[in-house]
């Protein structure tokens, strides 16, 4: 988001046309939602927060745009180009460290090609560079918060022996 704002300025957007506000929803978000000079709210996140925002915005007749809790499947059929599918599935799952609503959160694979696809997906994922998200060569950066880290860790632990964390 920060880079998008920088690029919009470089593209000639006047100052103040696009504003990216970072912070906790309970503080920064609430201030924006309740400010009389903010006519429109766009939010991407969880359904509980989205519902609360919709109620607050409706009371003030503010326009809203909500993208809530997307769960996007990535589907691989037997006739797919498995190399390309694995590369794209890894990219889809880990873009923005998997923390955006349009990331592939489920991969559905036709059983006849599952073993080959798994092997290729592991290779594609292993080839991704983990590091500073500000560096162009980085594919996977840090998680946004400790609470999100714990959520990811819990998801890994919840599947028990049917999944593995690989380095």
Segments (PLM) and residue ranges:
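PLP-dependent aminotransferase-like
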Residues: 1-29
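Conserved functional loop/turn residues at catalytic and ligand-binding sites
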Residues: 12, 36-37
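ALDH superfamily catalytic-core signature
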Residues: 34, 40, 46-167
């Amino acid at each position: 988001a920060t880079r998008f704002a920088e690029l919009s300025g470089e593209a000639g957007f006047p100052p103040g046309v696009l504003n990216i506000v970072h912070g906790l929803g309970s503080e920064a978000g609430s201030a924006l939602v309740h400010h009389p000079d903010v006519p429109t709210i766009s939010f991407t996140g969880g359904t509980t927060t989205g519902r609360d925002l919709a109620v607050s915005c409706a009371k003030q007749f503010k326009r809203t745009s909500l993208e809530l809790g997307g769960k996007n499947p990535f589907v691989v059929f037997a006739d797919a180009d498995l190399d390309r599918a694995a590369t794209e599935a890894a990219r889809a799952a880990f873009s923005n460290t998997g923390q955006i609503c349009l990331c592939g959160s489920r991969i559905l694979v036709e059983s006849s090609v599952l073993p080959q696809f798994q092997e290729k997906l592991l290779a594609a994922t292993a080839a991704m560079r983990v590091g500073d998200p500000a560096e162009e060569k980085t594919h996977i950066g840090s998680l946004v918060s400790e609470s999100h880290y714990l959520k990811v860790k819990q998801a890994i632990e919840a599947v028990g022996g049917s999944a593995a964390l690989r380095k």
